A protein has these predicted regions:
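Bacterial N-terminal signal peptides that target proteins for export
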Residues: 1-11
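Short, well-ordered beta-strand elements
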Residues: 28-33, 180-192, 210-216
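Ligand-binding clefts/hinges and TM-proximal coupling segments of bilobed small-molecule sensing domains
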Residues: 58-64, 140-178
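Beta->alpha turn/N-cap motifs
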Residues: 82-83, 91-104, 191-192, 218-220, ...
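Periplasmic-binding protein-like
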Residues: 104-134, 140, 165-173, 257-269
Length: 279
């Protein structure tokens, strides 16, 4: 009887030791990279919330940041990086939320994307006061064309979604194209898909003797500062909320004149094909 009690006591001690060990074991930290600019970071965090990864506080009209995470059951660490650089650090994190233009350029495929009800139109912008110039109207007409719409739909097959409404033949009847013959329109753009889309508009303008000079930028700041400083006639690289926020923070005078496309944000991983890394 004494031996039975002794064995029972030993078993009880072992159970308690194992229980305390399990309780004390730290849950693995899951690193998720997101874009660092305010609008895209907030957008990424909302996508993670929709996916059940974390829960955000109600921030009202303010953009959510990682400090607004209210519930973090998966022990997620948010890693911020400039939007264009997120694909390059994918190997160093468990997951990354990436804008599809940068993902396409890097040859990446998401395992989940934003819903079809989420739209952040990427826009052609000019400096305030230049909305009605013949250069601007000629540029808008060339982009808001059947040629560009067909290119977006056939090339990206939904990875990039066309937002052009009623399109035309590429020309504006109110523009004096003869006066623009021999002139250059300089526009700043991200490489993919913006510069590729603009290449189609370039051909449309060339038929009227107008050169579209496409300057490619790899970041989210220089296209706006160059436009504000008069080095560019226009830019096309970002969505409306980003441009609104940029104006508010920098006192710039950037206005958007055409919604062209939107890029569904997706979740990517070089290790997992789903959210199994959270388990």
């Amino acid at each position: 009887m004494k031996n039975i009690k002794k064995i029972a006591s030993i078993l009880l001690v072992l159970i308690l030791v194992l229980s305390f060990a399990a309780c004390g074991k730290a849950k693995k930290t899951i690193k998720i990279a997101v874009p660092s600019d305010p609008t895209n970071e907030a957008r990424a965090l909302v996508l993670l919330q929709v996916q059940g990864v974390l829960t955000l506080k109600n921030t009202g009209d303010d953009l959510a940041t990682k400090s607004d995470i209210a519930d973090n059951p998966n022990n997620v660490e948010i890693v911020e990086a400039e939007a264009a650089q997120v694909p390059s650090i994918l190997k160093d994190v468990d997951y990354a939320v990436i804008n599809s233009n940068y993902a396409i350029e890097a040859g990446l495929t998401p395992f989940v994307t934003e819903g079809t009800d989420v739209s952040y139109p990427n826009v052609v912008c000019v400096k305030e006061g230049n909305e009605e110039t013949d250069k601007t109207k000629a540029l808008i007409a060339a982009i808001n064309s059947q040629q560009v719409k067909d290119f977006i739909n056939s090339t990206y097959k939904g990875a990039i979604v066309c937002d052009l409404g009623e399109v035309g033949d590429g020309y504006d009847a109110t523009v004096d194209y003869a006066a623009l013959n021999g002139t250059t329109i300089t526009i700043g753009a991200s490489p993919v898909p913006h510069a590729d889309i603009l290449a189609v508009a370039k051909e449309v303008l060339a038929a009227k003797g107008i050169t579209l000079d496409i300057k490619e930028f790899a970041d989210y700041v220089l296209p706006n500062t160059a436009l504000e400083d008069g080095e560019l006639d226009a830019n096309y690289f970002a969505h409306i909320p980003y441009q609104q926020n940029f104006n508010e923070e920098n006192g710039t005078h950037i206005v958007w004149v055409l919604e062209v496309h939107h890029e569904p944000m997706g979740v990517y991983s070089s290790t997992y094909s789903d959210w199994s890394g959270l388990k």
